[in-house]
Amino acid sequence: HFDNLAPKREAWIKKSKGFYSEDIKYMQELIPNGSSILEIGCGNGNLIGSLNPISGVGIDISAEMIIEAKKQYENINFTVADIEDTNCIKNLDQTFDFIIISDTIGYLNDIENTFDNLHKVCNADTRIIVAYYSPFWEPILNIAARFKFKMPELPKALLNETDISSLLDSAGYETVKYQKKIIFPFTLFGVGRFLNRFLSCVPILSYMCIRSYVVSRSLKSASLDTPKSASVIIPCRNEKGNIRNALERLP
């Protein structure tokens, strides 16, 4: 399926320019230039290539998608691999500042196990960003795909940001931020940018957004890198003359 779509992937992105440009803008807010980035399910490299990584690795199960990615972004290391294969992560000999899982999570057979394997490429400061469609929009997106307004996709799991956060929590991650974005997936001469910037932040209207972003960190990596500390508590009351002696006797 994805191999067949690879030659037309860039055309689909241009056709849905409003959506993809907003997605990239928000990712750029989350990820500073010059970061080390791993993208899982990178497709033709459009997203990771737009983030200017100092060190970038893109993984995709589709060989044809990787061929297209290598044509466009020579400075990024693209690899054909199945992220659910444990050897895929073992072959990565570095940790990353950011790990992006954009629209890929719904195709995984064992989401929690995949998250668990990713601890190996996390350090205390690594942030995992999971971006996914809102289930609310699924019927609309299916209709759009049927009438060729959107790239066709295989059936996938429907997950909201609470589901994703729970799966991350079960795998040993802590959610540090989540946000809904993109309420209007069209440019419309700049109107789309205005609506997405201001209306998607309104609490009630945010539930109508197409996109959710869940940002988390590895608790396993954080606990390994955090220096151990101890507290010594001395309960005192009306013992002004003894406090100095108590402190001096501490080892």
Question: What spans do the regions from the language model cover?
Answer:
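Cell-envelope/extracellular polymer assembly enzymes that use nucleotide-activated donors
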Residues: 228-231
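A conserved beta-strand element that flanks and buttresses the S-adenosyl-L-methionine
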Residues: 100
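Acceptor-substrate binding/catalytic loop of class I
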Residues: 146-163
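Class I SAM-dependent methyltransferase SAM/SAH-binding core
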Residues: 43-85
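Short, well-formed alpha-helical segments that are part of the catalytic scaffolds
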Residues: 239-251
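Conserved class I S-adenosyl-L-methionine
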Residues: 1-32, 46, 129-151, 189, 242
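A short glycine-rich, Lys/Arg-flanked "PGG" loop and its adjoining helix->strand segment in the class I
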Residues: 112-124
